[in-house]
Amino acid sequence: MTSNIILTGFSGTGKSHIGYIVSQMMRWDFMDTDDELTKRASATIEEIFKNYGESKFRQMEKALISEFSDLSNFVISTGGGAIVDEENYKYMKENGFIVCLEAKADTINARIKQQHNVRPLISQGDPHERINQLKSQRQHQYAMSDWTVHTDHLTPIQVAREIIRAWEIRQDQIYEQVRLG
């Protein structure tokens, strides 16, 4: 049986907030890989990018994601670009049910502006254009998720319920496959 729920998707789709809600509803632990990275590095993501570059950030992210195999009954929110790396995808697929949270570029842009967080890859140039560009580059990897939830017109609770419903469907499918041999 799948032992973790792993959230992926672009920045601003609600992964951290919704992941926490799902963990509370399921009485599971919650981990946000970006938060965990900033704790371990004693620096913000913006500082990591500025001082060490994106490649160092991705290296740290990969090391953290490889630790998934030791976790069980966790809801894990990953960074927006984590799934792009093949090894990260492999770890995610082997150790969890991957749910992609989707939203339109306009929705993402509005949410990011409300959060007042600096997103290093989006802050270069026109944010709306950059969001569209990065989403387009990552769409193939996001499409490899086990389930996708469009968050534009749903409340966080509705999204959380949809994730749990999807996870339960997947567990039933796995159980039937095992039972039928």
Each PLM stretch: what is its role?
Residues 7:
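Hydrophobic anchor at the beta1->P-loop junction of P-loop NTPases
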Residues 21, 25, 97, 136-181:
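NTP-dependent small-molecule kinase module
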Residues 24-32:
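Post-Walker A helix-loop "phosphate-sensing" segment adjacent to the P-loop in P-loop NTPases
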Residues 94-139:
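A glycine- and Lys/Arg-enriched "phosphate-lid" helix/loop adjacent to the NTP-binding pocket
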Residues 32-81, 86-93, 118-120, 127:
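ATP-dependent small-molecule kinase phosphotransfer cores
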Residues 16:
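Walker A/P-loop
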Residues 10:
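P-loop (Walker A) phosphate-binding loop of NTP-binding proteins
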Residues 13:
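ATP-binding Walker
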